[in-house]
């Protein structure tokens, strides 16, 4: 291990042999950090926090602090982080609450940019991008490959679907369907498929066509959700992506952005 002399690492913390802890960082007693992870200057990792392999934790990052929730009574709740993530300067990630999931989870290969905030009980998938100052309320769920622009604010309990894109400065208070492009605030609006993102991830022409047809029926036909789903099942060639979209919309508790 490479631990700077000014860093404070509790003797009970569990660190892999090649972990790097830079100047003035603080590592608490219930922290576990996997191989190849680097913790930058002035970072604080506390609480019951487990961080996987090859993560980059930059300066002034704060992970594992108590949730900003009035119900919290110092229970043993957790942060679980996967592998190959980047947490840029001043990112904050709070641990879960007992009345929530008990654990805030961040998957693998995510890029969380400067001053972003992940609140208690959030569930972040893999390959997610959160640009500078994007902030999540408690209990937010983000699917794989979703992207949030700068200064996006997401209301608690919102779900953000896989491969969706949210434009900078947007305020999100309803669910964002997978594969879609959403921009704006009060209200945010749906602007069609995230076509550029889907093409970058090599979605086939057939899948793109099926998603476009499904989008038009779900959100631009004037039909209610049940009738739109029935129409899609008759008129659109089925595929896993369309099934995921229909399941997401059908299971929404907050309603979806249109």
Curated annotation (Swiss-Prot):
SS bonds (residue pairs): none
InterPro entries, sorted: Acetyltransf_C, Acetyltransf_C_sf, Hexapep, Hexapep_transf_CS, Lipid_A_LpxA, Trimer_LpxA-like_sf
Pfam families in alphabetical order: Acetyltransf_11, Hexapep
Pathway: Glycolipid biosynthesis; lipid IV(A) biosynthesis; lipid IV(A) from (3R)-3-hydroxytetradecanoyl-[acyl-carrier-protein] and UDP-N-acetyl-alpha-D-glucosamine: step 1/6
GO annotation, cellular component aspect: cytoplasm; membrane
Enzyme class, UniProt record, top EC level: transferase
Example GO molecular function: acyl-[acyl-carrier-protein]-UDP-N-acetylglucosamine O-acyltransferase activity
Family matches, as SUPFAM superfamilies: Trimeric LpxA-like enzymes
Domain of life: Bacteria
PROSITE patterns: HEXAPEP_TRANSFERASES
Keywords: Acyltransferase, Cytoplasm, Lipid A biosynthesis, Lipid biosynthesis, Lipid metabolism, Repeat, Transferase
Metal-binding in keyword set: no
Compartment annotation: Cytoplasm
GO biological process terms held by the UniProt record: lipid A biosynthetic process
Membership in a protein family: Belongs to the transferase hexapeptide repeat family. LpxA subfamily.
Subunit note: Homotrimer.
Physiological role: Involved in the biosynthesis of lipid A, a phosphorylated glycolipid that anchors the lipopolysaccharide to the outer membrane of the cell.
Protein name, entry field: Acyl-[acyl-carrier-protein]--UDP-N-acetylglucosamine O-acyltransferase
Organism: Syntrophobacter fumaroxidans (strain DSM 10017 / MPOB)
